[in-house]
From Swiss-Prot:
The keyword rRNA-binding applies. This is Small ribosomal subunit protein bS20. GO terms for biological process: translation. It holds the Pfam family Ribosomal_S20p. Residues 1-10 have a biased composition (Basic residues). Binds directly to 16S ribosomal RNA. Residues 1-27 are annotated as: Disordered. Keywords: Ribonucleoprotein, Ribosomal protein, RNA-binding, rRNA-binding. HAMAP family: Ribosomal_bS20. One of its GO terms (cellular component) is cytosol. It comes from the Bacteria. Belongs to the bacterial ribosomal protein bS20 family. GO terms for molecular function: small ribosomal subunit rRNA binding; structural constituent of ribosome.
């Protein structure tokens, strides 16, 4: 543990942020995985719905500072491409 009071506080706040970011990141990954499963199953309606849900989750994570906006844009672009390639 750090000796300086401000560093002790930073350790606590960093841990809180880490836990919060971890849960948000996990939720986003879950939504992306559900989208990929829908695409793999060939279910266009479910994939379209899940694309919207995953894109929204990515946008929210960007506003919370979990993902960089370019990272989210790349992920959304990849999902849109995968969706458009569906027959």
């Amino acid at each position: 543990m750090a000796n300086i009071k401000s560093k002790q506080k930073r350790i606590l706040t960093n841990e809180k942020s880490r836990q919060r970011n971890k849960s948000v990141r996990s939720a986003v990954r879950t939504e992306i995985r559900k989208f990929r499963e829908a695409v793999a199953a060939g279910d266009k309606a479910a994939a379209e719905k899940q694309l919207r849900v995953a894109s929204r989750a990515l946008d929210k994570s960007v506003s919370k500072g979990v993902f960089h906006r370019n990272t989210a844009a790349n992920k959304k672009s990849g999902m849109a491409t995968a969706f458009n390639k569906m027959a």
